[in-house]
UniProtKB/Swiss-Prot annotation:
Transmembrane segments: none annotated. Keywords: Coiled coil, Isopeptide bond, Metal-binding, Phosphoprotein, Repressor, Transcription, Transcription regulation, Ubl conjugation, Zinc, Zinc-finger. A zinc finger (C2H2-type) spans 552-577. GO terms for biological process: negative regulation of T cell differentiation in thymus; negative regulation of transcription by RNA polymerase II. Transcription factor, which represses ZNF609 transcription. PANTHER family: BRAKELESS PROTEIN, ZINC FINGER PROTEIN 608. Residues 780-789 have a biased composition (Pro residues). Expressed at low levels in thymocytes. Signal peptide: none annotated. This is Zinc finger protein 608. GO terms for molecular function: zinc ion binding. It comes from Mus musculus.
Length: 1511
């Protein structure tokens, strides 16, 4: 096809150009183009060079007569369209082209007018669909996606240009396309030639088929556009029919491209049958407006196959600028010699490439639209066996470092089959975002573009897989629907609109680093046929993209969204409609289409799972999720995992078709995110379960099957997942907000256990425990059902970023959980079962809690929290990934990523060092831990996993169920949910860090392995307990029995894997630590930041000190009341206080013994083995857990008590060591990389932990020792408050008296902590709390928390806390507090839950309410738990609850905490931890803890002191 960019175009009307409306093609291009940063830039430059040098807009009127389908010399139209190459009078076009060449995005955005936009759009759109074009499309799409936002013109550019850009047709066409492509296009065009060769091969096949299909189009198109490659004219080069035909040529290819020709596009559009929708171009000429056109085009958007090969008309980048609209109309003949030349050059490939580069140009692009397919080029920094891929990629001229999670192993990405995050977002947008709100131009093409951009990211993830996947990338799924898109798009003009939703999924599959320029286009191989940009290969892609070529229409009455994958639809429904009707649609469709489409996805998931390649869950392009699983088995897991924006679709890849079929359903049911992770894990466990999980989301929307299927099918497999799902279901019910995530949340929810269990099994090499866990999770499955409501929360726009964070958190948690599970293989499953029960019991409570969380999260806090640092920037994207939040939950089960990744940071986790890169990849930049913290989204994952992937799984899932809450609460709460997992990895990762120094041996070995065993169990337990506690009031007895059984079992299991010392610690810790671990972990994870805050913020310090005093008082009261039990609830304030004091006195005795150990824990951490420090922590934690878990674990309590006794002994040892250390002046904490005060805080952490741990045994023992209680109460307070220094009995005895001494220490600590977490606490707490009033409340609270470890611990974002990681925080008094808070959190779930739920929601948002409530609940729950250890728990629980309630109410609003979570790095888990951990995360206890831990992990990751990051 000679690249005759016929001058005919000259005669073409500007309208024609307008009609050409690049929007369509651009969109298509976006679909096909995966933004290749380097490629784009290169192409841009190349194209500019080409255009400038060979500005010859070829007359290329040859094709004018070509397939006369266009009637008039398509060449004319093409020429016109190509005229842009020759900078002639096409003023509008010229501007557009110029802009296009310069910044197509801008042009599209400015949408110059249909005419202007259209000309360039036409040029872009015209870009040949040749194979290269397809590639270009893939590449250009990401940029185009953005461009798409701008305007149709841009869309065309993106669509048509996209392909051509990639294709570059390696000939004049490439150049011409470059010209047409303009800047953005040229970007891609530069590599376009290369693409032409590579892409051409691939695109050629597809494009050629299409070309053959649309050869007549091509004839005209060729005539019209010198880039007459077969593919090229596809764009509607045969737009000649349209009259001017200039636009139509584009139309042919882009479907909308023709639209560029305005009315003519319509004519051409039919010609551009290939483009399918391109035909749909409905005479956009009338709609000359670029945006309108884009919308229309978008709707009509050429089929995903997209034949993006916008004819080569876009001859040269310079041409684009050169060609003015007038030029366009004026010259039908030689648009410009340069164009001709370029076209001629390009023509041979038949891949007419129009560069969409402009759209892709970073300068011209705003934030990428969700669902934009992106081709990322970069370097793999690290890949772990857990499916974490750390990459340094260039996109839009910006370099990104990220962690990609293997979708297969980590399922916390948007549903793989969600056709487009954009669509779902739009649907969700109904909630808060305009449908197209996400699209800058509000053009469907734009959105598609964004979706595909996401897919492009996914491409990176696809890795080598990219080639096969390539086809799936379409502007709107152009690529994605090679089968689907063409037919679907063709079938329904509006399908383009929908298509934008679907393609991202498919794109995601493609988007892998391998996808980059050469491989990216080729990636379609996985997809099989869909290699052609035109999407001719409909079968292959059909399978992946959708069960049938036809897009699945949203059954909702008022919704015309179409999805290639049922998952996309499900996601959309869950988020947008959340109606039972969706459920029907989803279910049948799901079963049907997901069977087909997700079959590949499942396969991919399986493949990914096997190869650890795809992080399906991680695929955050919930919308694009369709292709997500498609990564070939060999695809690096990290690759897939990376694209949080667009990877979701990856799951839907065709690679695993046969295996994926079974899995496809699973995935389908799992709704992609769970699918991959769950599929991976569940693949091991059971495809059916996965299916159910996948179904869960839709069921979630339905609220029917989810529970049933989840409960039944995923019972063993996804106890946690189910749990989450139940919560989701409940949340969903409670909060209809669930926009699109409805389908996903169940996945996410399903994933937690599945991930915890199955994912863990699949994710980490040490998966054995995972499998066991999975089985064990079976009991939880029914309880998981209540979590279903989660989607509702997910629906919250705010949740979007948090969703991403959640996903990452989940992933991390999952990893962590995996590790934890490994270590706690035996214990984990029991925990899981226990969790299941707890979840079941507290599903409702959790739901409420989740609801509150959702509400709070709904507040900007959820967003702030969830959107950590970079998450905020990705908010739109994350919004699109609300689904991903669910996916995060889904991913949460990927402890591999969470655990491994998190632990990776410290490379402490059993051979998890690789995970550190994951952390880095996971956007936790600083160290490995820092790396995981660096990126909010990744940080969440890291932190979540680090903080307690396990709990986060459950809790995080539940949190995810309450999306917003999970957003920060998942950030906070995911971490909270995964305290064990998180703590363990955190510890591991922080094992090098001083916080984990002692903990490393303990937590890393003990906690890590046993801890992992126990952490997942504990994490699960924590999550479970969080849910448990929530439900505890509901099913306190049942839970107690079961939980205790589980706890004892867990203790046994945990103990068995653990070393004796570790065993005792973990056993103790597993029951007490299981929850306390989460909590303490969080506390520890947070505590470091507190110091930073204190140090950094005098105000905070003041407030904190005051608060600390109050808290100590409250804590004392609470500890007493909490220790006291539920029975004393009435008299808790007085009696329990006394009892608590006595108990605390006794306990402080041990605590004091351990108190010296508090510094010692650092030392002993290393020395005694983390066991002793752990014991100290565990003592505090034990107290917490005691109150919290005593209910939960009667048997466990006994076992734990034994271990507590051991721990007490060890604590005494530690106390000696600590004392010597203290006396020696060696700050045990110095062992931890933290300032002395921070270490002091660490001591606090440890001492409370020990106190907590000792609490169960000391409850008995110290009840005996009541004599010692006067002295010990102060001690305990001291231990709790200022364990490190003020462990002396004096401190606790007079709360205030102790305050002076202890407060000196504690104030120092607090100051340190404040310095440490000034931003965190100051922001979260200072802002949140009246310094004096909350302090008074928090005083008892703090006392309960041992000097308010959480406030200190509360600053997980603080490096100290981060370094401490959830593990430290877990054991440390924060642990106690955590259980305290946890208890309130759980307590909230329990008796108080309902009443406190409202408070909790504020709590989540406001520390004040949160703390008061959490404390109340804490007390309540503590009472429940402390029924086992009556005295301390009761008082602590009740009193603390009360005080916490007041305290929290006035202390700080959750918004502040949320804010901190939002600044994940800054606040990390720290911000809401104290209140949030207690009350705010009553429903989200684990989530809060997880979030806190995330912050803590982040703190360590972001440097020892998050304060730096915090600020």
């Amino acid at each position: 096809m000679s690249v005759n960019v016929s001058t005919a175009g000259k005669g073409v009307d500007p309208n024609t150009v307008d009609t050409y409306d690049s929007g369509d093609d651009w969109e298509i291009g976006v679909g096909n183009l995966i933004i290749d940063l380097d490629a784009d830039l290169e192409k841009d430059r190349q194209k500019f060079e080409m255009n400038n040098s060979t500005n010859t807009t070829t007359n290329t009127t040859k094709d004018c007569g070509g397939p006369a389908s266009n009637g008039t010399c398509s060449t004319s139209a093409l020429a016109d369209g190509l005229k842009f190459a020759s900078v002639q009078p096409s003023a509008p076009q010229g501007n557009s082209h110029k802009e296009t060449s310069k910044s197509k995005v801008k042009r599209a955005k400015t949408s110059k007018d249909a005419n202007k936009s259209l000309p360039s759009a036409a040029l872009y759109g015209i870009p040949e669909i040749s194979s290269t074009g397809k590639r270009q499309e893939v590449q250009g799409r990401p940029g185009e996606a953005t461009g798409m936002n701008s305007a149709l013109g841009q869309s065309v550019s993106g669509g048509g240009s996209s392909n051509p850009n990639s294709n570059g047709t390696s000939t004049g066409t490439s150049a011409a396309t470059a010209g047409a492509g303009s800047c953005g296009k040229s970007k891609e065009e530069k590599p376009g030639k290369s693409h032409s060769s590579r892409g051409a091969k691939r695109d050629k096949d597809a494009a050629r088929s299409r070309k053959e299909k649309h050869d007549l189009l091509q004839g005209h198109q060729n005539g019209g556009g010198g880039q007459a490659p077969s593919g090229g004219h596809l764009y509607g080069f045969g737009t000649k029919s349209n009259g001017s035909g200039a636009s139509p040529f584009h139309c042919g290819g882009a479907g909308s491209g023709s639209v560029g020709a305005a009315g003519e596009v319509s004519k051409t559009a039919p010609d551009s049958t290939l483009m399918g929708n391109s035909m749909l171009v409905k005479k956009e000429e009338e709609e000359e407006e670029s945006h309108r056109r884009i919308k229309k085009l978008k709707t009509e958007k050429v089929d995903p196959l997209f034949t993006v090969p916008a004819p080569p008309p876009p001859i040269a980048s310079s041409l684009a600028p050169q060609i003015p609209p007038s030029y366009f109309p004026p010259s039908s003949s030689n648009i410009a010699a340069p164009v001709e030349q370029l076209l001629v050059r390009t023509r041979s490939v038949g891949v007419n490439t129009c560069e969409v580069g402009v759209v892709t140009e970073p300068e011209c692009l705003g934030p990428c639209e969700p669902g934009t397919s992106v081709n990322l080029e970069g370097i793999v920094w690290h890949e772990t066996e857990e499916g974490v891929l750390v990459v340094n990629v260039t996109w839009r001229n910006k370099t990104y470092v990220g962690t990609l999670l293997d979708c297969t192993k980590h399922d916390w990405a948007p549903p793989r089959f969600c056709e487009s995050p954009t669509s779902d977002l739009e649907m969700r947008g109904g909630r808060g975002r305009g449908k197209r709100a996400r699209s800058a131009a509000a053009a469907p093409g734009s959105e598609v573009s964004f979706t595909e951009s996401r897919g492009l990211q996914s491409k990176n993830r696809g890795g080598a897989n990219g080639k096969g996947r390539r086809g799936s990338l379409n502007a709107s799924g152009r690529r994605t629907p090679p089968n689907c898109a063409a037919e679907d798009i063709k079938a329904s003009p509006s399908s383009t609109n929908k298509r934008k939703n679907k393609p991202p999924m498919e794109l995601d599959l493609n988007s892998s680093s391998e996808d980059s320029k050469p491989g990216k286009r080729v990636r379609t191989n996985s997809r099989s046929t869909p290699t052609t940009p035109q999407g001719k290969p409909e079968t292959t892609f059909l399978d992946q993209g959708c069960s049938s070529p036809v897009l699945i229409d949203c059954p909702h009455p008022n919704c015309n969204k179409k999805y290639k994958h049922i998952n996309g639809l499900r996601y959309h429904q869950a988020h947008a409609h959340l109606d039972p009707e969706n459920k029907l649609e989803f279910e049948p469709d799901s079963e049907d289409k997901i069977s087909d489409c997700e079959e590949a996805l499942s396969n991919v998931a399986l493949e990914c799972n096997e190869s650890s390649t795809s992080v399906s869950s991680y695929d955050q392009t919930k919308a694009p999720g369709s292709p997500g699983a498609g990564n070939p088995p060999g695809t690096p897991k990290g690759k897939r995992e990376h694209v949080s924006n667009g990877p979701g679709p990856i799951i839907g890849s065709k690679t695993g078709k046969n295996s994926g079929k079974k899995r496809g359903l699973n995935n389908e049911l799992n709704n992609l995110p769970v699918i991959s992770n769950m599929t991976a894990a569940l693949d091991i466990c059971s495809a059916t379960d996965s299916n159910l999980t996948a179904e869960m989301p839709k069921l979630e929307a339905e609220g029917l099957i989810d529970k049933k299927s989840l409960g039944d099918k995923e019972k063993g497999k996804k106890a946690n997942n189910c749990k989450m799902d139940k919560n989701l279901s409940k949340l969903k019910s409670a909060r209809p907000i669930a926009p699109a995530p409805a389908p996903t949340p169940p996945q996410l929810i399903a994933i937690p256990t599945a991930a915890f269990t199955s994912t863990t099994t699949g994710t980490i090499p040490g998966l054995p425990s995972l499998t066991t866990t999975v089985v064990q999770a079976t009991p939880k499955s029914p309880p998981l059902k209540p979590i279903q409501p989660k989607p509702t929360i997910m629906g919250e726009p705010i949740t979007v970023n948090p969703a991403l964070v959640s996903l990452k958190d989940r992933k991390k948690k999952e990893k962590r959980k995996l590790k934890d599970k490994e270590g706690k293989e035996t214990g984990g499953p029991k925990m899981d079962a226990k969790l299941g029960k707890l979840e079941e019991a507290k599903a409702a409570s959790k739901d409420l809690s989740g609801h509150f969380l959702k509400d709070h999260l709904g507040k900007s806090e959820g967003l702030a929290n969830g959107l950590s640092e970079s998450q905020e920037s990705r908010m739109a994207s994350i919004k699109a990934e609300a689904d991903k939040v669910y996916t995060f939950t889904d991913n949460a089960p990927s402890p591999s990523i969470g655990s491994a990744s998190r632990m990776e940071c410290s490379t402490l986790v059993n051979g998890q060092a690789p995970m550190a890169p994951l952390h880095v990849l996971t956007q936790n930049g600083a160290e490995s831990a820092a790396a995981k913290t660096s990126s909010p989204a990744y940080s969440d994952i890291s932190d979540a996993a680090d903080d307690g992937g396990s709990d986060s799984r459950s809790e995080g899932m539940r949190s995810k169920a309450s999306s917003p809450s999970d957003t920060f609460s998942n950030k906070d709460g995911v971490v909270k949910g995964h305290p064990s997992t998180s703590a363990q990895p955190s510890q591991l990762k922080e094992s090098h860090s001083p916080y984990y120094h002692g903990y490393e041996p303990y937590y890393s070995p003990s906690y890590m392995h046993p801890g992992q065993v126990g952490a997942p169990a504990a994490g699960n337990g924590g999550s479970t307990q969080g849910m448990k506690i929530k439900k505890e009031s509901e099913e306190d007895a049942e839970k107690k029995d079961k939980a205790e059984q589980l706890e004892s079992k867990k203790v046994d299991h945990t103990s068995a894997p653990l070393q004796p010392q570790h065993q005792s610690v973990i056993t103790q810790r597993h029951p007490a630590l299981a929850q306390s671990l989460y909590y303490g972990q969080y506390a520890y994870g947070l505590y470091m930041d507190q110091k930073s805050l204190m140090a950094t913020s005098p105000a905070y310090r003041q407030q904190y000190e005051k608060y600390y005093e109050d808290q100590r008082l409250a804590e004392q009261k609470m500890a007493q009341s909490g220790r006291g039990d539920c029975e004393r609830k009435a008299e808790l304030p007085l009696k329990e206080l006394g009892k608590e004091d006595n108990k605390q006195k006794n306990m402080p005795s041990a605590t004091i013994s351990k108190a010296p150990s508090t510094p010692e824990p650092n030392k002993n951490h290393s020395k005694l083995g983390p066991s002793v420090p752990n014991k100290t922590e565990e003592t505090g934690k034990s107290q917490l857990l005691s109150s919290h878990q005593q209910q939960l674990q009667a048997d466990s309590f006994k076992a734990k008590q034994m271990e507590n006794h051991q721990l007490i002994k060890e604590a005494v040892e530690m106390k000696s060591v600590m004392d010597s250390m203290k006396q020696t002046g060696v700050d045990p904490t110095s062992r931890f990389k933290q300032d002395p005060e921070s270490r002091t805080w660490h001591h606090y952490v440890y001492q409370p932990k020990y106190l907590d741990q000792q609490k169960p045994e000391e409850l008995d023992r110290e009840k005996k020792l009541k004599e010692d209680s006067p002295r010990k109460t102060p001690n305990k307070e001291s231990g709790v408050s200022s364990l490190p220094v003020s462990l002396t009995n004096i401190k606790e005895e007079p709360k205030e008296g102790k305050r002076p001494d202890s407060q000196s220490v504690e104030e120092n600590k607090l100051k340190n902590d404040d310095r440490k977490t000034p931003v965190n606490w100051k922001d979260s707490r200072g802002t949140r709390v009246a310094v004096s009033s909350p302090m008074s409340q928090h005083q008892s609270y703090i006392q309960y928390l041992h000097a308010y470890p959480y406030p200190q611990m509360y600053d997980p974002s603080h490096p100290a806390y981060r370094a401490v990681s959830p593990v430290l925080m877990h054991s440390y008094p924060g642990a106690y507090l955590s259980p305290g808070f946890h208890y309130p959190v759980y307590g909230k779930m329990s008796g108080r839950e309902e009443a406190e739920k409202v408070n909790t929601s504020p709590s989540i948002n406001t520390k004040t309410a949160s703390e008061a409530k959490a404390l109340d609940l804490l007390q309540h729950h503590a009472n429940q738990y402390r029924s086992k250890s009556p005295a301390p728990v009761e008082k602590a629980s009740t009193e603390r609850e009360r005080e916490a309630e007041r305290e929290r109410d006035r202390h700080s609003p959750f918004s502040q905490r949320h804010l901190h979570t939002h600044h994940h790095t800054h606040v990390g888990m720290g911000y809401p931890l104290i209140p949030g951990q207690y009350d705010p995360f009553q429903g989200l206890t684990s989530a809060a803890l997880v979030a806190s831990q995330q912050v803590a992990a982040q703190a360590s990751a972001s440097g020892m002191f998050p304060a730096q990051r915090r600020e």
